[in-house]
Curated annotation (Swiss-Prot):
The lineage of its organism: Bacteria, Pseudomonadati, Pseudomonadota, Gammaproteobacteria, Pseudomonadales. Its main location: secreted. One of its GO terms (molecular function) is inositol hexakisphosphate binding. It is an enzyme of class 2 (transferase). It comes from Pseudomonas syringae pv. syringae. GO terms for cellular component: extracellular region; host cell cytoplasm; host cell nucleus; host cell plasma membrane; host cytoskeleton; membrane. Serine/threonine-protein acetyltransferase translocated into infected cells, which impairs host microtubule network and host immunity by mediating acetylation of target proteins. Blocks secretion in host cells by mediating acetylation of host tubulin, thereby impairing host microbubule network. Impairs host cell immunity by mediating acetylation of host TIFY/JAZ transcription repressors (Arabidopsis thaliana TIFY10B/JAZ2, TIFY11A/JAZ5, TIFY11B/JAZ6, TIFY5A/JAZ8, TIFY9/JAZ10 and TIFY3B/JAZ12), thereby activating host jasmonate signaling. The gene is hopZ1a. Its EC number is 2.3.1.-. The active site is at H150, E170, C216. Interacts with host plant JAZ proteins (e.g. Glycine max JAZ1 and Arabidospis thaliana TIFY10B/JAZ2, TIFY11A/JAZ5, TIFY11B/JAZ6, TIFY5A/JAZ8 and TIFY3B/JAZ12) and triggers their degradation. Binds directly to SZE1 and SZE2 at the host plasma membrane; this interaction with a complex made of, at least, SZE1, BKN2/SZE2, ZAR1 and ZED1 triggers host immunity. This is Serine/threonine-protein acetyltransferase HopZ1a. It catalyses: L-threonyl-[protein] + acetyl-CoA = O-acetyl-L-threonyl-[protein] + CoA; L-seryl-[protein] + acetyl-CoA = O-acetyl-L-seryl-[protein] + CoA; L-lysyl-[protein] + acetyl-CoA = N(6)-acetyl-L-lysyl-[protein] + CoA + H(+).
Length: 369
Protein backbone atom coordinates (compact mmCIF):
# COMPACT_ATOMS: atom_id res chain seq x y z
CA UNK A 1 0.00 0.00 0.00
CA UNK A 2 2.95 2.34 -0.51
CA UNK A 3 1.17 3.92 -3.43
CA UNK A 4 1.77 7.56 -2.67
CA UNK A 5 3.53 10.29 -4.57
CA UNK A 6 6.62 10.86 -2.45
CA UNK A 7 10.03 12.36 -2.96
CA UNK A 8 11.08 15.50 -4.76
CA UNK A 9 9.91 19.03 -4.25
CA UNK A 10 6.55 20.40 -5.19
CA UNK A 11 8.24 23.69 -6.06
CA UNK A 12 10.29 22.20 -8.93
CA UNK A 13 7.99 22.75 -11.89
CA UNK A 14 8.14 20.31 -14.75
CA UNK A 15 7.60 21.38 -18.33
CA UNK A 16 5.95 18.75 -20.47
CA UNK A 17 7.02 18.61 -24.09
CA UNK A 18 4.65 16.45 -26.12
CA UNK A 19 6.88 16.77 -29.16
CA UNK A 20 9.89 15.50 -27.27
CA UNK A 21 7.93 12.80 -25.46
CA UNK A 22 6.10 11.38 -28.43
CA UNK A 23 8.38 11.92 -31.44
CA UNK A 24 10.29 8.70 -32.25
CA UNK A 25 13.82 8.58 -33.63
CA UNK A 26 13.99 9.14 -37.39
CA UNK A 27 14.84 5.48 -37.91
CA UNK A 28 11.53 4.46 -36.34
CA UNK A 29 9.19 6.94 -38.00
CA UNK A 30 6.47 5.51 -40.26
CA UNK A 31 7.74 1.96 -39.85
CA UNK A 32 5.45 -1.05 -39.32
CA UNK A 33 6.71 -1.34 -35.74
CA UNK A 34 5.90 2.31 -35.13
CA UNK A 35 2.40 1.95 -36.58
CA UNK A 36 1.82 -1.17 -34.52
CA UNK A 37 2.86 0.63 -31.33
CA UNK A 38 0.57 3.55 -32.19
CA UNK A 39 -2.32 1.15 -32.66
CA UNK A 40 -1.46 -0.40 -29.30
CA UNK A 41 -1.65 3.02 -27.64
CA UNK A 42 -5.09 3.58 -29.10
CA UNK A 43 -6.28 0.21 -27.82
CA UNK A 44 -5.27 1.07 -24.27
CA UNK A 45 -8.02 3.65 -24.03
CA UNK A 46 -10.88 1.19 -23.82
CA UNK A 47 -13.35 3.41 -21.97
CA UNK A 48 -15.86 5.28 -24.11
CA UNK A 49 -16.61 7.56 -21.15
CA UNK A 50 -12.94 8.48 -20.79
CA UNK A 51 -12.65 8.96 -24.54
CA UNK A 52 -15.54 11.41 -24.44
CA UNK A 53 -13.71 13.49 -21.83
CA UNK A 54 -10.59 13.36 -23.99
CA UNK A 55 -12.57 14.58 -26.99
CA UNK A 56 -14.19 17.35 -24.93
CA UNK A 57 -10.81 18.76 -23.84
CA UNK A 58 -8.94 18.56 -27.15
CA UNK A 59 -10.34 21.73 -28.78
CA UNK A 60 -9.55 23.79 -25.67
CA UNK A 61 -5.96 22.52 -25.58
CA UNK A 62 -5.64 23.27 -29.30
CA UNK A 63 -6.37 26.95 -28.66
CA UNK A 64 -4.41 27.22 -25.40
CA UNK A 65 -0.98 28.77 -24.95
CA UNK A 66 1.91 28.48 -22.54
CA UNK A 67 2.33 26.03 -19.65
CA UNK A 68 -1.39 25.29 -19.38
CA UNK A 69 -1.35 24.02 -22.98
CA UNK A 70 1.53 21.68 -22.17
CA UNK A 71 -0.28 20.52 -19.03
CA UNK A 72 -3.45 19.84 -20.97
CA UNK A 73 -1.54 17.90 -23.62
CA UNK A 74 0.20 15.82 -20.96
CA UNK A 75 -3.16 14.99 -19.38
CA UNK A 76 -4.57 14.01 -22.77
CA UNK A 77 -1.56 11.81 -23.47
CA UNK A 78 -1.82 10.06 -20.12
CA UNK A 79 -5.55 9.48 -20.48
CA UNK A 80 -4.93 8.10 -23.97
CA UNK A 81 -2.44 5.58 -22.61
CA UNK A 82 0.65 7.20 -24.09
CA UNK A 83 3.91 7.09 -22.19
CA UNK A 84 4.70 10.29 -20.30
CA UNK A 85 7.82 11.04 -18.27
CA UNK A 86 6.43 13.69 -15.93
CA UNK A 87 5.09 13.64 -12.39
CA UNK A 88 1.43 14.58 -12.39
CA UNK A 89 1.67 15.32 -8.68
CA UNK A 90 3.98 18.20 -9.63
CA UNK A 91 2.07 19.24 -12.75
CA UNK A 92 -1.26 19.19 -10.91
CA UNK A 93 0.18 21.18 -8.01
CA UNK A 94 1.65 23.76 -10.39
CA UNK A 95 -1.79 24.44 -11.90
CA UNK A 96 -3.85 23.83 -8.76
CA UNK A 97 -4.39 27.52 -7.96
CA UNK A 98 -6.31 27.99 -11.22
CA UNK A 99 -8.49 24.99 -10.44
CA UNK A 100 -9.11 26.19 -6.89
CA UNK A 101 -10.23 29.56 -8.25
CA UNK A 102 -12.66 27.92 -10.68
CA UNK A 103 -14.12 25.58 -8.06
CA UNK A 104 -14.57 28.39 -5.54
CA UNK A 105 -16.51 30.27 -8.21
CA UNK A 106 -18.62 27.23 -9.02
CA UNK A 107 -19.28 26.28 -5.39
CA UNK A 108 -20.12 29.26 -3.14
CA UNK A 109 -19.06 28.48 0.41
CA UNK A 110 -16.41 25.97 -0.64
CA UNK A 111 -13.71 28.31 0.67
CA UNK A 112 -10.95 26.11 -0.73
CA UNK A 113 -7.35 27.17 -0.18
CA UNK A 114 -4.09 25.86 -1.61
CA UNK A 115 -1.26 26.03 0.94
CA UNK A 116 2.45 25.54 0.37
CA UNK A 117 2.70 23.30 3.44
CA UNK A 118 0.91 22.39 6.67
CA UNK A 119 2.45 25.39 8.44
CA UNK A 120 0.39 27.70 6.24
CA UNK A 121 -2.66 25.72 7.33
CA UNK A 122 -1.74 26.38 10.95
CA UNK A 123 -1.38 30.10 10.23
CA UNK A 124 -4.85 30.11 8.67
CA UNK A 125 -6.27 28.58 11.86
CA UNK A 126 -5.00 31.59 13.78
CA UNK A 127 -6.25 34.29 11.40
CA UNK A 128 -9.64 35.82 10.74
CA UNK A 129 -11.52 34.04 8.02
CA UNK A 130 -14.53 31.85 7.29
CA UNK A 131 -15.55 29.48 10.05
CA UNK A 132 -15.52 26.57 7.60
CA UNK A 133 -12.93 26.02 4.88
CA UNK A 134 -11.04 23.32 3.03
CA UNK A 135 -7.32 23.22 2.29
CA UNK A 136 -5.00 21.20 0.07
CA UNK A 137 -1.33 21.05 1.01
CA UNK A 138 1.76 18.90 0.39
CA UNK A 139 3.35 16.91 3.15
CA UNK A 140 6.76 17.78 4.54
CA UNK A 141 9.79 15.55 5.07
CA UNK A 142 10.62 15.54 8.82
CA UNK A 143 14.34 15.06 8.19
CA UNK A 144 14.90 17.86 5.67
CA UNK A 145 11.88 20.15 6.01
CA UNK A 146 11.41 19.83 2.24
CA UNK A 147 7.88 19.81 0.85
CA UNK A 148 7.07 16.58 -0.95
CA UNK A 149 4.86 15.58 -3.84
CA UNK A 150 2.15 13.86 -1.81
CA UNK A 151 -0.86 16.08 -1.01
CA UNK A 152 -3.78 15.69 1.37
CA UNK A 153 -7.00 17.63 2.00
CA UNK A 154 -8.14 19.09 5.31
CA UNK A 155 -11.73 20.06 6.13
CA UNK A 156 -11.66 22.67 8.91
CA UNK A 157 -14.16 24.20 11.32
CA UNK A 158 -13.28 27.18 13.51
CA UNK A 159 -15.27 27.37 16.73
CA UNK A 160 -15.83 30.63 18.59
CA UNK A 161 -14.21 30.40 21.99
CA UNK A 162 -12.78 26.96 21.28
CA UNK A 163 -10.09 25.12 19.37
CA UNK A 164 -10.60 24.21 15.70
CA UNK A 165 -11.55 20.74 14.53
CA UNK A 166 -9.74 19.24 11.54
CA UNK A 167 -10.51 16.26 9.31
CA UNK A 168 -7.55 15.26 7.12
CA UNK A 169 -8.40 12.95 4.23
CA UNK A 170 -5.55 10.73 3.06
CA UNK A 171 -6.27 9.45 -0.47
CA UNK A 172 -3.84 6.54 -0.17
CA UNK A 173 -2.58 5.17 3.17
CA UNK A 174 -1.52 6.58 6.52
CA UNK A 175 1.56 4.41 7.05
CA UNK A 176 3.23 3.80 3.67
CA UNK A 177 6.48 2.11 2.77
CA UNK A 178 9.10 2.18 5.53
CA UNK A 179 6.60 4.16 7.65
CA UNK A 180 7.45 7.32 5.69
CA UNK A 181 3.84 8.42 5.29
CA UNK A 182 3.21 7.95 9.00
CA UNK A 183 6.24 10.08 9.89
CA UNK A 184 4.93 12.91 7.71
CA UNK A 185 1.46 12.75 9.19
CA UNK A 186 3.06 12.76 12.64
CA UNK A 187 4.99 15.92 11.76
CA UNK A 188 1.73 17.65 10.84
CA UNK A 189 0.13 16.45 14.08
CA UNK A 190 3.14 17.55 16.14
CA UNK A 191 3.09 21.07 14.70
CA UNK A 192 -0.70 21.31 15.15
CA UNK A 193 -0.30 20.30 18.79
CA UNK A 194 2.49 22.83 19.37
CA UNK A 195 0.25 25.54 17.89
CA UNK A 196 -2.40 24.81 20.52
CA UNK A 197 -4.74 22.46 18.64
CA UNK A 198 -5.72 19.49 20.84
CA UNK A 199 -5.04 16.33 18.85
CA UNK A 200 -8.28 14.89 20.22
CA UNK A 201 -9.94 17.31 17.79
CA UNK A 202 -8.02 16.06 14.75
CA UNK A 203 -8.86 13.01 12.63
CA UNK A 204 -7.05 11.40 9.71
CA UNK A 205 -9.32 9.46 7.37
CA UNK A 206 -7.59 6.88 5.16
CA UNK A 207 -9.55 6.07 1.98
CA UNK A 208 -7.08 3.75 0.18
CA UNK A 209 -8.71 4.89 -3.08
CA UNK A 210 -5.50 6.11 -4.73
CA UNK A 211 -3.64 3.20 -6.31
CA UNK A 212 -1.70 5.10 -8.97
CA UNK A 213 1.55 6.77 -8.04
CA UNK A 214 0.88 10.48 -8.50
CA UNK A 215 -2.83 11.38 -8.53
CA UNK A 216 -2.96 12.69 -4.95
CA UNK A 217 -3.60 16.32 -5.93
CA UNK A 218 -6.62 15.39 -8.03
CA UNK A 219 -8.00 13.16 -5.27
CA UNK A 220 -7.52 15.95 -2.74
CA UNK A 221 -9.26 18.48 -4.99
CA UNK A 222 -12.15 16.09 -5.52
CA UNK A 223 -12.35 15.38 -1.78
CA UNK A 224 -12.58 19.10 -1.03
CA UNK A 225 -15.53 19.46 -3.40
CA UNK A 226 -17.18 16.34 -1.97
CA UNK A 227 -16.66 17.55 1.60
CA UNK A 228 -18.44 20.81 0.77
CA UNK A 229 -21.31 19.02 -0.96
CA UNK A 230 -21.66 16.74 2.07
CA UNK A 231 -21.12 19.54 4.60
CA UNK A 232 -23.95 18.39 6.87
CA UNK A 233 -22.34 14.98 7.31
CA UNK A 234 -18.97 16.59 7.93
CA UNK A 235 -20.59 18.91 10.48
CA UNK A 236 -21.62 15.80 12.42
CA UNK A 237 -18.04 14.51 12.40
CA UNK A 238 -16.74 17.91 13.54
CA UNK A 239 -19.33 17.99 16.32
CA UNK A 240 -17.97 14.70 17.63
CA UNK A 241 -14.38 15.94 17.38
CA UNK A 242 -15.31 18.99 19.46
CA UNK A 243 -15.98 16.50 22.24
CA UNK A 244 -12.87 14.46 21.45
CA UNK A 245 -14.66 11.56 19.77
CA UNK A 246 -14.90 9.99 16.31
CA UNK A 247 -17.81 7.62 15.83
CA UNK A 248 -16.99 4.03 14.83
CA UNK A 249 -13.27 4.62 15.46
CA UNK A 250 -13.06 1.65 17.83
CA UNK A 251 -13.82 -0.70 14.92
CA UNK A 252 -12.74 1.46 11.98
CA UNK A 253 -9.18 2.25 13.08
CA UNK A 254 -8.29 -1.44 12.82
CA UNK A 255 -9.18 -1.36 9.11
CA UNK A 256 -6.52 1.25 8.36
CA UNK A 257 -2.83 0.65 7.71
CA UNK A 258 -2.24 2.46 11.00
CA UNK A 259 -4.44 -0.02 12.84
CA UNK A 260 -2.60 -2.94 11.27
CA UNK A 261 0.72 -1.49 12.43
CA UNK A 262 -0.59 -0.76 15.92
CA UNK A 263 -1.78 -4.35 16.26
CA UNK A 264 1.82 -5.55 15.95
CA UNK A 265 3.41 -2.76 18.01
CA UNK A 266 3.81 -2.46 21.75
CA UNK A 267 3.98 1.34 21.65
CA UNK A 268 2.04 4.24 20.16
CA UNK A 269 3.01 4.83 16.53
CA UNK A 270 0.90 7.95 15.87
CA UNK A 271 0.81 10.98 18.14
CA UNK A 272 -1.45 10.15 21.04
CA UNK A 273 -4.92 11.61 20.99
CA UNK A 274 -5.34 11.96 17.22
CA UNK A 275 -8.10 9.90 15.64
CA UNK A 276 -7.94 7.61 12.62
CA UNK A 277 -10.58 5.77 10.61
CA UNK A 278 -11.15 3.99 7.31
CA UNK A 279 -12.94 6.22 4.83
CA UNK A 280 -15.75 3.81 3.96
CA UNK A 281 -16.83 3.80 7.62
CA UNK A 282 -17.29 7.55 7.95
CA UNK A 283 -17.34 9.23 4.52
CA UNK A 284 -20.12 9.33 1.91
CA UNK A 285 -19.94 6.83 -0.94
CA UNK A 286 -19.03 9.46 -3.54
CA UNK A 287 -15.56 9.76 -1.96
CA UNK A 288 -14.86 6.45 -3.71
CA UNK A 289 -16.26 7.53 -7.07
CA UNK A 290 -12.78 7.80 -8.60
CA UNK A 291 -11.27 4.78 -6.84
CA UNK A 292 -8.90 2.88 -9.12
CA UNK A 293 -9.52 -0.67 -7.89
CA UNK A 294 -12.49 -2.75 -9.07
CA UNK A 295 -11.79 -5.23 -6.26
CA UNK A 296 -12.14 -2.44 -3.71
CA UNK A 297 -15.36 -1.21 -5.33
CA UNK A 298 -16.88 -4.69 -5.16
CA UNK A 299 -15.81 -5.18 -1.54
CA UNK A 300 -17.25 -1.83 -0.49
CA UNK A 301 -20.58 -2.56 -2.15
CA UNK A 302 -20.82 -5.85 -0.22
CA UNK A 303 -20.76 -4.09 3.15
CA UNK A 304 -23.63 -5.35 5.33
CA UNK A 305 -24.63 -1.79 6.27
CA UNK A 306 -25.15 -0.89 2.60
CA UNK A 307 -23.62 2.59 3.03
CA UNK A 308 -21.37 2.10 0.00
CA UNK A 309 -24.09 0.74 -2.31
CA UNK A 310 -25.69 4.07 -3.27
CA UNK A 311 -25.25 6.22 -6.35
CA UNK A 312 -22.02 8.09 -6.96
CA UNK A 313 -23.17 10.32 -9.81
CA UNK A 314 -25.26 13.43 -9.30
CA UNK A 315 -29.04 13.53 -9.32
CA UNK A 316 -28.81 15.42 -12.60
CA UNK A 317 -28.05 12.18 -14.44
CA UNK A 318 -31.06 10.22 -15.65
CA UNK A 319 -29.67 6.89 -14.44
CA UNK A 320 -28.00 6.19 -11.11
CA UNK A 321 -24.47 4.79 -11.17
CA UNK A 322 -22.90 2.81 -8.32
CA UNK A 323 -19.23 2.22 -7.51
CA UNK A 324 -18.80 -0.90 -9.61
CA UNK A 325 -20.63 0.58 -12.59
CA UNK A 326 -18.48 3.71 -12.43
CA UNK A 327 -15.29 1.69 -12.16
CA UNK A 328 -16.21 -0.49 -15.12
CA UNK A 329 -17.25 2.51 -17.22
CA UNK A 330 -13.76 4.04 -16.86
CA UNK A 331 -11.78 0.81 -16.82
CA UNK A 332 -8.67 0.77 -19.03
CA UNK A 333 -5.70 -1.46 -19.64
CA UNK A 334 -2.48 0.45 -19.41
CA UNK A 335 1.16 0.02 -18.52
CA UNK A 336 1.72 1.74 -15.19
CA UNK A 337 4.29 1.87 -12.40
CA UNK A 338 2.77 0.05 -9.47
CA UNK A 339 3.67 0.11 -5.77
CA UNK A 340 6.86 -1.88 -6.26
CA UNK A 341 7.91 0.49 -9.07
CA UNK A 342 8.12 -2.29 -11.65
CA UNK A 343 6.23 -2.02 -14.96
CA UNK A 344 3.20 -4.26 -15.19
CA UNK A 345 0.25 -4.53 -17.50
CA UNK A 346 -2.83 -3.93 -15.40
CA UNK A 347 -6.44 -2.88 -15.58
CA UNK A 348 -7.89 -0.16 -13.40
CA UNK A 349 -10.41 2.65 -13.42
CA UNK A 350 -9.07 5.85 -14.96
CA UNK A 351 -11.95 7.87 -13.52
CA UNK A 352 -9.50 10.18 -11.74
CA UNK A 353 -7.92 10.91 -15.14
CA UNK A 354 -11.36 11.90 -16.36
CA UNK A 355 -11.71 14.24 -13.40
CA UNK A 356 -8.37 15.87 -14.26
CA UNK A 357 -9.46 16.39 -17.88
CA UNK A 358 -12.70 17.96 -16.67
CA UNK A 359 -10.89 20.38 -14.35
CA UNK A 360 -8.41 21.43 -17.04
CA UNK A 361 -11.31 22.00 -19.42
CA UNK A 362 -13.00 24.28 -16.87
CA UNK A 363 -9.83 26.33 -16.46
CA UNK A 364 -9.30 26.66 -20.20
CA UNK A 365 -12.97 27.44 -20.85
CA UNK A 366 -12.69 30.35 -18.41
CA UNK A 367 -9.48 31.60 -20.04
CA UNK A 368 -10.91 31.35 -23.56
CA UNK A 369 -14.26 33.04 -22.88
Amino acid sequence: MGNVCVGGSRMSHQVYSPDRADTPPRSERNTPDRRQRAAGDAERTQSMRLQQKINDLKPYVRHARGPIKAYGQAALDRASGKKTSVSFAELDATHLDAMVYIENQRNPGLNLKHFRDHKELIQALQSDGPSAFRAIFPQTCPETGQTLKHHVMADVRLHQGGAPTIIITEPAVIVGARYQQLQRHNLTLEDLSESGVPLSQVAIIETQAQKTSDDCVMYSLNYAIKAHKNAAQFDDIHHGLQHGTLSTESESRARTTLGALEASSSYSVMHEGAHAAFGADVLPVDFYKHGASLTQAKQLMKRPDGRMAGRVNSEGHSEAENLVQRNQAFRVKRRELLDDETPSNTQFSASIDGFRLQEIKRVLAEEQR
